């Protein structure tokens, strides 16, 4: 026993085992007859009936669990025996705790605790000396935080504790030698880590120089999403935070938003002038036959006299420009009187407010001329009225009819032309599903049955019997249910291990009577049919004997649904082309026999035929469980089973997000995927946490001895099965969760013994049931803790369960006294709980420094470096997870109150395996948890066939992705902090490049792992078998985060250095280097050569920042491949739609313009006069939002909030940003700090931009940029310089048809300017505040001859866009316009003659002599000027498609603004409606 690696006190404990078993007074054992000496031998007369009842000892075995399972001899070595080591399962070597050894274990725990305290004291002393030796005095401020003060106070207490116990632990000399050895080892490790992190001694000194630099993460990476119904906070770990933290993305978004605003203005003016020239009724009469339309008795009910000639009616009386749902040809002479006879009938009888509520009439349907049925087919619309209300305003329709006609049912004039019966049958579902059951739409290829519940209408309330009868029809046959449950516990259970398998299966047997089918019990304890002929035996009755069985039924439905979705055949088919072979991982199908593969294929084909509809879960949670009431109102019926159902419900909502439109009752139209970023999950998790507190899960069950006393009562209650009334003296939680297990054990011991509490066998079974219940208790609590950490990491929100050990003493599931010899997979679950909790502690340490305001406000560089090094050691396998957690605690990065010291006796052999070992496990047949020892082939043959091993390895794979995503985030934060400092401190350039390279490496690693996952999910028996639904969103989210950093680097590689917002414009007007023919030819040739090199590119290799000019092309190829992936995944996963649109947006935006596309029409390819609005399905529509939506967008606020005010730098270009008036009004009068000019880390001497090649391009500049003549000053002002505004007004002013109320404060009203002033500042970008609801009634411009001549002399584009950027100089504020009582302006034509007689065309009268080809349209010049983003030539044609335009007013009508968020638009095939009041109306 001397060669054992375990502690020296263990052999003494093991040696006293056999001698102490029989005489220890503390052992709860019962010796069998004949086991003692002859003096204790039983009498001879006990040989008949009494000898049948044998008493078994409650002896805890000494051998490990694995050896007893394999039935081999165990050498009982600690921490793992030799047999387990040879077999390759040393990580599972587990010994049951001896009850008499608790005192000895406590002594061991004390020694281990003292050892950890000594290590922590030394680490704190080292940190304190480092701080004192630092020359910076500001670094000491960060130690004045409450946590740091408690840390040092704790160190003094620990030092006192160590000094008090040192003499009892060991001698002083031995302690001194041990400390010296540990100090030497730590110094060597620190030196090696520093050497690996820095290439030479100079870089090491540079790193040490900036170690105490402080970073403020509370301002750079915090977002607030302002929605129409509230706000959502998005922290530094959210995927949108990178858009705020990166300066290049911030400037790009500002440029894009400005472009979008300009383009929308052009769209509006074009549509306004098209209405101005065509004086038509807003009601489309094209559907009526010509003969019927010409009849005098069938005139339009709209009063055309309300309109001025050629003008659109006022908004409050004008129906929105859509097709009128009333067929105007169907009215006979007795229905609608002619307009001449009835002067009071001046309004359309259709209530057009219904349009704003969401009803869209059909576009192509032609109704019958004289039909009285509905002209609206509600079944063809995706947007129906929210209530069954007729769109015809009956008050306006029937007010002129006599009473006898109105009451006559035979008179056709008394009937509404809308068929109300069809409206009742096709009424839209309300936002809340309290009245109807949503209809199930099975996916393509589904073999789901047609259930009556999907075709019938349900009342507002269904009785329990009706719900159960409907569920019986929805559930699959009995044998299929048993197969689904078996598949779940074999493949999916490790992802959500909060159930007791035996207990749950017994509950299912009781509810569905699966044991009545001549069952044969399989290895899992589930009753299975003995013949395949019973395959189609349906569920005829559902028994719910207890209240908690409703929750068990809900869990069963989630399991059936989730398992069906997770079948490999249901996964999305991904074809990446030639790159697919790079992302393949070996599978284990070669190790399976042909018969096993055939049997597996038959089972999957059987399961595919039986899909459980999502409506079954809705019925159960709404009518049986009443989950909304339980989670929000009352906790009377909350028990352990209720918490389990809530966790399963939350898990299902995140995994199967496509069903959220049916399951959720909240309206999340503003989010593309309400299943992951929505705040509804935050509320649900908070409810789960509070229910756990209500049940007492935060306290360990060993603290409550009364749990042991409830078993006899529970057993008796279950034996008398059939009544829902529970014993009032029985704990309801135990009654609901342990009854089935007790019933099963009691039935095996006989009915007489089950009613007898004196039976020792029954006592033992009861004890086992108690331990299994406590085990489930602990598993649920730590799973909630893990959910809290994952949500905080995903959304960047603070954790709910902070400082866990301050209020919870629940032990890990490994503390449960359970014999796992019959359930090895539960042993793996227990090991995973311990490992995953330790990984969560590492994540908590990172989240504390990023999200906690007290730490994130002044976090230091060396703290982030320590976190990076420890996480790298963990994911690369160079350090055990126990050592990593200990290092975090010793360095003060993780407080002990988070639970770091909860596992002092953890298995060091069970750690996170290396990622290559996980992926290559099937190919090389390597030991996944090898401890470095070589194993022979004979040992491999003896290896135990472990259950759900592939699922466990898939979970390990996801943990690696999470850790490496944190490493990417930490390096990115440091990179963005030090990159702008390079211009002031050149020493930071080395640090910035190192952090950028590390961030790129981890970003590419996440990108590759995402591709590996989706490229292997359909492979049979692969690593990700049955994990396609559970891991799809986490993998795709990490891939999406990686692409954001790729975009940042592409911008740096193409744009070059930033010049700084306060120094000069980042948008150079008129730069045409990208349109020079010779330059274009050279760019095309370089692009072709680089594309040939990319064909040979290996996507599995890392990308080097020193790749030069090919860096952007290499990264672009990654983006294209990811776009291809998300496009294929969009067919199955809704959240892939948002990511596909985001990727497609940047791909289109950063695409290099080619010469062919620019010269197709002789240099006029950007002439968009005939250009039509593209289809939404072919463009990125997420930027199509109105003013209110844009101002709520966090990226918009951050992108445009830092722009310097106009006039601060007169040399700045007018395209640079918004005016002072608009900017300060939006941002509350505050300005974000300016962005400093600096060179990016990708900038090299060979990467110079061709910004100086402007000689020839300047000569070709259009005369639009030469200058303009100001009538007020008669001075030529260069086009690139904005005139200084007078009277404090900005050079950018509101449009002609609307003006800001800030200009009315002085009592002056602007007059109508001339066209010279209208076009004088066409290049200036107006702010969003120019769009107001104030309207000005102007005379009809079509009546003015000069105005008409100027229109004729312009191109269609010019006439449509000439008033897009109207400037109202202060000289025009002379009060020539008066406001009438209605709030509209009337032009005083008597004072100035004709108000529009002085209007001239742009550039004065010279325009009349110029042709349309000599003068380019405004939009073209605008796009040409703004296609240059800091040297990056953005393709204007793709920019129009990417940014999107002003939506056609004919499609307007909804007044509920969709919450705007970039790349978040649900309606990919429908137009996003604007709020009509935000755009002016021309009259």
UniProtKB/Swiss-Prot annotation:
GO CC annotations, alphabetized: nucleus
Start-end of DNA-binding region: 64-93
Compartment annotation: Nucleus
Compositional bias per record (Low complexity), positions renumbered to this chain: 130-142, 177-208, 735-759
HRM repeats: 280-285, 299-304, 323-328, 347-352, 389-394, 415-420, 1192-1197
One Pfam family cited in the UniProt record for this chain: Zn_clus
Compositionally biased spans, kind Polar residues: 1-50, 143-152, 160-176, 432-447, 706-734, 1388-1411
Protein residues bound to Zn(2+) 2: 64, 81, 84, 93
Keywords: Activator, Coiled coil, DNA-binding, Heme, Iron, Metal-binding, Nucleus, Repeat, Transcription, Transcription regulation, Zinc
Quaternary structure, from the entry: Binds DNA as a homodimer. Interacts with SRO9 and YDJ1. In the absence of heme, binds to at least four cellular proteins, including YDJ1 and SRO9, forming a high-molecular-weight complex (HMC) which results in repression of its activity and dictates its DNA-binding specificity.
Name of the molecule in the record: Heme-responsive zinc finger transcription factor HAP1
Biological source species: Saccharomyces cerevisiae (Baker's yeast)
Lineage of source species: Eukaryota, Fungi, Dikarya, Ascomycota, Saccharomycotina
């Amino acid at each position: 026993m001397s060669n054992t690696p375990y502690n020296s006190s263990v052999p003494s404990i093991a040696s006293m085992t056999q001698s102490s078993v029989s005489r220890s007074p503390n052992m709860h054992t019962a010796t069998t007859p004949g086991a003692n000496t002859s003096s204790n031998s039983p009498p001879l007369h006990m040989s008949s009936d009494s000898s049948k009842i044998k008493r078994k000892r409650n002896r805890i075995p000494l051998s490990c669990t694995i050896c007893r399972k394999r039935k081999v001899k165990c050498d009982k070595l600690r921490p793992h025996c030799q047999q387990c080591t040879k077999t390759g399962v040393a990580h599972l070597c587990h010994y049951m705790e001896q009850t008499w050894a608790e005192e000895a274990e406590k002594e061991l725990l004390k020694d281990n605790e003292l050892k950890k305290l000594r290590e922590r004291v030394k680490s704190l002393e080292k940190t304190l000396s480092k701080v004192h030796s630092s020359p910076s005095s500001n670094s000491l401020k960060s130690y004045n935080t409450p946590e740091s003060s408690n840390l040092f106070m704790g160190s003094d207490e620990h030092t006192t504790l160590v000094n008090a116990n040192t003499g009892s632990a060991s001698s002083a000399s031995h302690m001194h030698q041990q400390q010296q050895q540990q100090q030497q080892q730590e110094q060597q490790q620190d030196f090696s880590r520093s050497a690996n992190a820095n290439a030479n001694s100079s870089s090491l000194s540079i790193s040490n120089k900036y170690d105490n630099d402080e970073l403020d993460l509370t301002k750079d990476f915090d977002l607030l999403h302002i929605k129409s119904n509230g706000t959502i906070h998005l922290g530094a770990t959210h995927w949108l935070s990178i858009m705020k933290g990166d300066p290049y993305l911030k400037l790009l978004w500002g440029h894009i938003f400005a472009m979008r605003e300009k383009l929308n203005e052009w769209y509006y003016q074009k549509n306004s002038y098209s209405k101005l020239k065509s004086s038509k009724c807003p009601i489309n009469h094209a559907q009526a036959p010509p003969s019927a339309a010409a009849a005098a008795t069938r005139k339009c009910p709209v009063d055309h006299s309300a309109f001025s000639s050629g003008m659109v009616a006022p908004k409050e009386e004008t129906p929105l420009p859509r097709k009128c749902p009333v067929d105007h040809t169907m009215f006979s002479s007795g229905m609608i009187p002619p307009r001449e006879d009835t002067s009071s009938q001046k309004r359309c009888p259709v209530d057009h407010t219904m349009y704003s509520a969401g009803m869209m009439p059909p576009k192509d349907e032609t109704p019958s001329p004289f039909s009285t049925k509905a002209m609206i087919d509600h079944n063809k619309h995706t947007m129906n009225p929210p209530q069954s209300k007729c769109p015809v305003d009956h008050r306006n329709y029937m007010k002129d009819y006599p009473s006898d006609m109105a009451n006559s049912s035979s008179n056709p004039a008394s009937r509404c032309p809308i068929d109300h019966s069809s409206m009742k049958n096709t009424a839209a579902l309300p936002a809340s599903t309290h009245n109807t059951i949503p209809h199930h739409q099975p996916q393509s290829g589904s073999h789901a049955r047609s259930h009556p519940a999907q075709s019938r209408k349900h009342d507002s309330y269904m009785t329990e019997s009706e719900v159960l009868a409907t569920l019986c029809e929805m559930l699959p046959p009995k044998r299929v249910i048993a197969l689904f449950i078996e598949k779940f516990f074999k493949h999916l259970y490790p992802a959500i291990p909060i159930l007791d398998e035996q207990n749950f299966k017994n509950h299912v047997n009781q509810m569905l009577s699966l044991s009545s089918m001549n069952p044969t019990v399989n290895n899992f304890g589930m009753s299975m049919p003995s013949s395949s002929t019973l395959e189609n035996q349906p569920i005829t009755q559902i028994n719910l004997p207890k209240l908690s069985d409703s929750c068990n039924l809900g869990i069963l439905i989630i399991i059936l649904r989730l398992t069906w979705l997770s079948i490999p055949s249901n996964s999305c088919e991904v074809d990446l082309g030639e790159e697919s072979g790079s992302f393949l991982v070996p599978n284990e199908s070669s190790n399976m026999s042909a018969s096993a593969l055939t049997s597996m294929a038959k089972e999957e084909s059987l399961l595919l035929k039986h899909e459980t509809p999502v409506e079954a879960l809705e019925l159960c949670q709404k009518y049986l469980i009443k989950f909304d009431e339980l989670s929000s109102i009352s906790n009377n019926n909350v028990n352990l089973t209720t918490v389990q159902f809530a966790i399963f419900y939350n898990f299902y909502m995140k995994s199967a997000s496509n069903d959220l439109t049916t399951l959720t009752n909240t309206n999340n139209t503003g989010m593309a995927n309400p299943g992951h970023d929505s705040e509804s999950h935050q509320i649900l998790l908070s409810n789960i946490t509070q229910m756990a507190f209500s049940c007492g899960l935060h306290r360990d069950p060993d603290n409550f001895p009364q749990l042991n006393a409830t078993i006899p009562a529970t057993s008796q209650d279950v034996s008398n099965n059939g009544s829902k009334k529970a014993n009032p003296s029985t704990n309801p939680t135990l009654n609901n969760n342990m009854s089935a297990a007790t019933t099963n054990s009691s039935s095996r011991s006989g009915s007489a013994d089950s009613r007898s509490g004196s039976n020792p066998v029954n006592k033992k079974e009861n004890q086992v049931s108690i331990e299994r219940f406590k085990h489930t208790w602990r598993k649920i609590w730590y799973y909630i803790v893990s959910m809290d950490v994952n949500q905080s990491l995903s959304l960047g929100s603070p954790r709910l369960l902070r400082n866990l050990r301050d209020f919870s003493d629940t032990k890990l599931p490994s503390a449960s006294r359970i014999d796992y010899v019959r359930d090895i997979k539960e042993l793996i679950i227990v090991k995973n709980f311990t490992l995953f909790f330790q990984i969560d502690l590492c994540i908590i340490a990172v989240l504390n420094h990023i999200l906690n305001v007290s730490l994130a406000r002044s976090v230091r560089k060396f703290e982030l470096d320590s976190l990076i090094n420890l996480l790298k050691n963990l994911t690369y396998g160079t350090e055990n997870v126990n050592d990593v957690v200990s290092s975090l605690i010793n360095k003060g990065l993780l407080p002990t109150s988070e639970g770091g010291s909860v596992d002092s006796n953890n298995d060091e052999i069970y750690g996170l395996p290396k990622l290559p070992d996980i992926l290559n496990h099937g190919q090389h047949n390597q030991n996944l948890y090898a401890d470095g020892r070589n194993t022979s082939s004979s040992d491999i043959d003896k290896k135990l066939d472990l259950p759900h091993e592939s699922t466990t390895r898939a979970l390990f794979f996801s943990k690696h992705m999470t850790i490496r995503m944190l490493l990417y985030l930490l390096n990115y934060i440091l990179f963005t902090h030090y990159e702008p400092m390079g211009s002031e401190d050149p020493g930071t350039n080395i640090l910035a490049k190192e952090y950028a390279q590390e961030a790129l490496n981890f970003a590419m690693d996440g990108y590759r792992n995402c591709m590996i996952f989706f490229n292997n999910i359909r492979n049979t028996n692969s690593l990700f078998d049955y994990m396609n639904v559970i891991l799809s969103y986490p993998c795709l989210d990490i891939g999406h985060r990686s692409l954001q950093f790729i975009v940042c680097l592409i911008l740096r590689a193409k744009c070059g250095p930033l010049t700084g917002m306060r120094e000069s414009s980042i948008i150079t007007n008129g730069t045409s280097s990208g349109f020079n023919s010779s330059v274009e030819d050279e760019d095309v040739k370089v692009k072709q050569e680089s594309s040939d090199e990319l064909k040979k590119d290996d996507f599995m290799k890392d990308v080097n920042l020193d790749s030069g000019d090919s860096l952007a092309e290499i990264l672009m190829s990654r983006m294209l491949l990811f776009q291809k992936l998300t496009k294929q995944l969009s067919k199955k996963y809704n959240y892939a739609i948002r990511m596909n649109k985001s990727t497609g947006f940047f791909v289109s935006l950063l695409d290099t313009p080619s010469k062919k596309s620019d010269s197709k029409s002789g240099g006029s390819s950007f002439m968009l006069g005939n250009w039509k609005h593209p289809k939404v399905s072919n463009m990125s529509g997420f930027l199509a939002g109105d003013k209110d939506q844009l101002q709520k967008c966090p990226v918009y606020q951050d992108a445009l909030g830092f722009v310097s005010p106009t006039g601060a730098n007169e040399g700045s270009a007018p395209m640079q940003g918004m005016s002072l008036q608009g900017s300060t009004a939006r941002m509350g009068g505050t300005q974000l700090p300016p962005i400093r000019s600096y060179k990016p880390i990708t900038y090299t001497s060979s990467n110079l931009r061709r910004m100086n090649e402007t000689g020839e391009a300047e000569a070709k500049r259009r005369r639009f940029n030469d200058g303009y003549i100001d009538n007020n000053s008669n001075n030529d002002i260069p086009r690139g310089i904005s005139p200084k505004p007078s009277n404090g007004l900005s050079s950018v002013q509101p449009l002609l048809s609307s003006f800001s109320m800030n200009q009315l404060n002085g009592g002056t009203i602007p007059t109508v300017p001339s066209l010279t002033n209208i076009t004088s500042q066409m290049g200036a970008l107006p702010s969003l505040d120019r769009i107001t609801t104030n309207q000005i009634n102007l005379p009809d411009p079509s009546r003015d001859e000069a105005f008409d001549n100027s229109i004729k002399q312009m191109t269609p584009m010019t006439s449509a866009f000439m008033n897009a950027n109207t400037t109202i100089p202060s000289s025009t504020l002379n009060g020539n316009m008066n406001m009438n009582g209605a709030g509209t302006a009337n032009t005083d034509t008597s004072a100035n003659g004709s108000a529009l007689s002085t209007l001239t065309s742009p550039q004065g009268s010279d325009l009349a002599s110029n042709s349309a080809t000599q003068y380019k349209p405004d939009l073209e010049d605008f796009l040409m000027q703004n296609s240059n983003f800091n040297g990056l030539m953005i393709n204007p044609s793709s920019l129009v498609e990417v940014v999107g335009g002003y939506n056609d007013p004919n499609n307007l009508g909804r007044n509920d603004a969709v919450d705007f968020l970039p790349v978040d638009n649900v309606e990919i095939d429908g137009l996003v409606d604007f709020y009509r009041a935000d755009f002016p109306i021309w009259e």
